[in-house]
Amino acid sequence: VAPGAVAAGAVAVVTDAAGAELLAGLPVPLLVVADVRGVAGRLAAFVYGEPAEHLAMFGVTGTNGKTTTSYLLDGGLRRAGRTTGVIGTVQILIGDQVVPSVRTTPESPDLQAILATAVEKGVQAVSMEVSSHALAYGRAAGIRFEATAFLNLTQDHLDFHADFEDYFEAKAKLFTPQYTKRAIVDVDDEHGRRIVERCRANGVEVHTFSVKGVPADWSAQDIDLAADDSTFTVVAPDGSRHKASAGLPGDFNVANALAAIVMLAVSGIELQTAIAGVGDVHGVPGRMERVQIPGQGFLAVVDYAHTPDAVQTALAALRPLAERGHGRLRVVVGCGGDRDKAKRPMMGAAAVRLADEAVFTDDNPRSENSADILAAVTAGADAELAGAAQNYRVVADRAAAIAYAVAASRPGDVLIVAGKGHEQGQEIAGVKKPFDDRVVLRAALEASAGTGAAAGSGAEAEGEKGRSEQ
């Protein structure tokens, strides 16, 4: 790579000590550093003219909720008249231009190039997901955010981080003066309360929020949850009360909405404008996304929930809707291969604990044997049931699992297909094939109603999202 870069005009190479030995014959200076990734962000920012300094940057981190909160932020910024950009898991938006997203937070040279393009296009504010991988690798170096939000921290990515504390420390890096001017923290999460302590110790301005009655600067009260949206009252630090809404179901989306509102309000956006803009957002790709056909009779949604906590939270949010319709709550879910193995039994346990029926299926097995992954998931389910009647079945083929769940659903029921959300491919044995849960679910609904073809892989979908990071 380095010789090719030099041939293309590079005037110097940044490398580490091992690389310096291999590249000793190059006719350009070698800048030897201990951590190449650690300096790449600052170098890239310099090369591209420090684009983040010309943008109002908003960063969101947490195991769950980053994508939704970023889209809600974007809604508020647009309502305030800003030209906006969004960088995250689903896609990259530069104004109204859509760019495919390979990872949650791009590598630092790519990220700085994207920000430079945003400046050229007249973008004024950017909402950005910041993953623990990005913080560990220094991808966000060269950016100082107007505001950053901490949403939550739960089991995930222990295939990458040494342990849970290492995962926390990676997230905590975002809440230092190097990265942020002000922090907005959910203190319903115990790790959020630790982040507050870090902020105060580091001299970072911090604003807390809660949707569960924990003492905080901002809170959501009078929460009313419906199948498609939620309404609530924002209680500001001065005690004033403001009606608000989130165009997404679930109390966790009230938390996401409140996070976005607070980020905007403490960064100079008028509170009523922030509330209205967040309420403008009625749907985020693959996040509690409703799929329906005429005469369906039951609620069916696709969600990205792919951690034990996310599955539990999603099911807890949908349970009242099933009870309201005197129906059953059913979940289709699996676990990805070549990733955090410790969460597999926990996923199975969460599914059988909160659903009336769980259908365990393939997610992205990648290089692993599907049966081994499903065995770990069902082991967790069996342990949770502790001899009680089995309320799950295994259907390895994902399209068949979705078709079964649709056929089993009756009026008043609620069905959630969890784990892949917006993804448009499935990786099995190193081969990526088109697969979109939304397309497959719709086909299954139409087939069950006798109005369409049998559910397949969703071959209409194109592309394949890369590795997800939290």
What are these regions (language model features)?
Residues T15, G19-L26, K121, S127, ...:
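Acidic, Mg2+-coordinating active-site environments of NTP-dependent enzymes
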Residues V39-V187, R193-N202, A454:
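Phosphate-binding loop of NTP-binding sites
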